[in-house]
Amino acid sequence: YGIPTSLNIDDQAVATQPAEIWERFNQLHPEVRQRWRRRRRLETIDTGKVNRLLEADRLKLREVELQYGTDSAEYQAAEAEIEARRKRLEEEFNLIRAEIDQLDAENARYKLVVQTASGQPHELLLADIVRCYPANRLDGWAKTGVYLDRWREFLTDSPREANSEGGVFPAIWGTVVMTLLMSIAVVPFGVLAALYLREYARAGWAISIVRIAVNNLAGVPSIVFGVFGLGFFCYFVGATIDQLFFEAKLPSPTFGTGGLLWASLTLALMTLPVVIVATEEALAAVPRSMREGSLACGATKWQTIRRIVLPKAMPGIMTGMILAMARGAGEVAPLMLVGAVKLAPELPLDSTFPFLHLERSFMHLGFHIYDLGFQSQNSEAAKPMVFTTTLLLICLIAAMNLIAIGLRSALRRRYQHSQF
């Protein structure tokens, strides 16, 4: 907060009175911010596209080198083709860079000088001012507008100032995508395991050991799953995938480090006992008369399970999925080891083929809360962001659970009159 003392263009004051400064600011600020948004788009999207094409050409040349050697005709032809394309891309990059410099130079002309509470003057670029309002002259509607605008920024913008300002859109996106992938991974395996234990396995010491192991797995600390995911998924499975399919990128890892896929599988493994237990209970609740009626009509055991048992048990299976989502979406400790980062330069889901990038690191609301609360340079100043992000995480988990509960209710209504 501060008192405006002058608005400068090219280091010349064009307004010195508060009313005049406010009027000129409202005239100039939208234009300046539009140039700032154009600059950010050029720097993040257009420049990123050129860099991806340059990297793809480098990897293509590396693959040809590994396959044919540097003295081969194939390598010479590929090198000539890629060199011509590289020059064209560098020209395109220079044009983008020139436009960015032009926008920076234009925005640098506009500055606002404010006097802080300590009486010291402070100069701000208009492009760096996200919003400005006369705090002591706002009526109820204006205050509501500022409040709603802050929420819009919080939900749709990217973080600024070491995550202590701005929005959490990348963290929302990462949390939702990771939770959905975790659910897609854990539900089929959990249902298959429960079907085998309940419908096919014969009672004995081996099945007893499996049930004990499943129950004990539910009590393992989450950080242990994170260590397992790092060692098995990242360093073993991921490194093997890199050796087989991404040799040209080595020694830089592709799947041999933390990423969205390994984080989802680690949390799927952690929530697997929840789905198994819930599915077993749902299968046990299916009336015996329905099974016997189906078998008496000539159906096989698998046909009975597929047509009678599973549809009737589906609401209970959905309950297990809801519990798994609720637990997995809020976990932080495993994600610190297998993919969550403080700031992700790219989203795991975007418009670039193949659209879903399973190897990328991602931001997560739970890790974002931890980072603000314990890793921020000024934890006290970050407390409002911590509380707001916590509320958002609770609401996000509740929203995903409500959607799953709605699906469960629809399935329950569909099959509630299907008794023999």
Question: Where in this protein do the model-derived segments appear?
Answer:
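Transmembrane-helix boundary motif in ABC transporter permease subunits
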Residues: 182-214, 227-228, 235, 404-413
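Transmembrane alpha-helices
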Residues: 276-287, 301-339
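Membrane-topology segments of multi-pass transport proteins
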Residues: 1-164, 419-420
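Membrane-interfacial helix termini and adjacent extracytoplasmic/periplasmic loops
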Residues: 148-166, 201, 206, 225-269, ...
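Alpha-helical membrane-interface segments at transmembrane helix boundaries
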Residues: 156, 160, 165-177, 181, ...
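Interhelical loop and adjacent transmembrane-helix boundary motif
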Residues: 162, 338-392
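Hydrophobic transmembrane alpha-helices
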Residues: 213-220, 233, 261-275, 279, ...
